[in-house]
Amino acid sequence: MEPFLFCAACGMIWDKSEVETMARKTRVVRTELPAGRRVLAISDAHGNLPFFQGALKAAHYTPDDVLVLVGDLVEKGPDSLTLLRAVMELAQHNTVYCLNGNCDNLVREFAEEPGAVEDPFYDHYLKMWGDRCLLIQMGRAVGLDPRGPEDLPALREAVRKHFAPELAFLASMPEIMVTPDYLFVHGGVADEEQLEGLDAWRCMKNDDFLSQGHAFRRWCIVGHWPVTLYHPHVPSAAPLLLPDRHIASIDGGCSLKWDGQLNVLELPRTPGGDFRWYAYDGLPTAVALDGQIPSSDSVNVRWGRNVLEVLERGELLSRCRHLETGRELEVLNEYLYCDQDGVTRCEDSTDYRLEIAPGDTVSVVRRLPDRALVKKNGVTGWYFGRLGEKR
């Protein structure tokens, strides 16, 4: 048997013995959302404080609103500790429900599980994510600079000693929250009626959830799997709503995707009403001066399905063949990389041309001499017209 398990959505490698220690039952909170107040759901902030603040501003968040954080508040972002403390402070004064995601579980497991400091996973994870790891941020906050497995015992003691409030807050987060009309869970569940007996880890890390065919009576609000991974042709980070199955998937790829965003889903005030959404991507904006018709056929080369053959190298772009589809497209050179096996892959790339009208405001992902990679309403694509400054 292989000694490690690979987590597709977050790039973690889990030791099998570690997985066994986490085989506990899910914690379920059953409640009713406060009547007459706006409810906003956010998932997968991943330690990105500016995106969290920007998303709340985009949604015109006020203390009267109810905030539901659907997991993965921390890890993989530069501000995990700062964001965690900001949410702890926010929760003292406002109505905030925080759910446990697979990344939120990591620090608590490290601090509490017997044998954690001997587990090779933690050394691997800290080296993989470095400054973007909450454990590293905690260590440095108290003067430690963990670099290898020999530093883990001291790091564990420091986390236990200096971060008791943070550990308690993380430990308090349930995996599932259920109301009469909604079910909130980070990864996903197969059945909304038999929740208490479910394995907690599988609720937090449920890869490719929408492809499993589940449908619900309540609306099931999930994160974990960046929504662009569900789109084979046109990349989109906008919340993905499936009314016929009552599922809303809202992970916009914040901190993980180069064109990612943090989404805020506003729930309908009454059952059967319309959802609204807001987002923040931190990108510069510009105004399109020329119109452009959209592509009729395109490909979204996305994580996990991104093996390429480089056909011709250019100065900024390279002509590549996407091996899964056989399609040829131009890929930004800075997006190309080789994995540990020497296989050429790329960050999420596309040949899609956005539909643009003169005067449209777009987010600029990359600007090249003859084109720009831009976003409009959460959709990423190429624009070959002129861009002007936004006034």
What are these regions (language model features)?
Residues 4-86:
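N-terminal active-site segment of His-dependent metallophosphoesterases
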Residues 44, 72, 87, 101-102, ...:
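Divalent metal-coordination and catalytic microenvironments
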Residues 46-51, 75-78, 103-108, 191, ...:
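Active-site environment of divalent metal-dependent phosphoester hydrolases
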Residues 76-174:
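Active-site neighborhood of divalent metal-dependent phosphoester bond hydrolases
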Residues 147-247, 254-258, 270, 275-280, ...:
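Acidic, His/Gly-enriched loop-helix segments that form or flank divalent-metal centers
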Residues 276-289, 325-343:
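Short, basic/aromatic beta-hairpin or loop at an interaction surface
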Residues 289-304, 311, 339-367:
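SH3/SH3-like (including bacterial SH3b) beta-barrel domains
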Residues 303-332, 356-391:
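SH3/SH3-like beta-barrel superfamily modules
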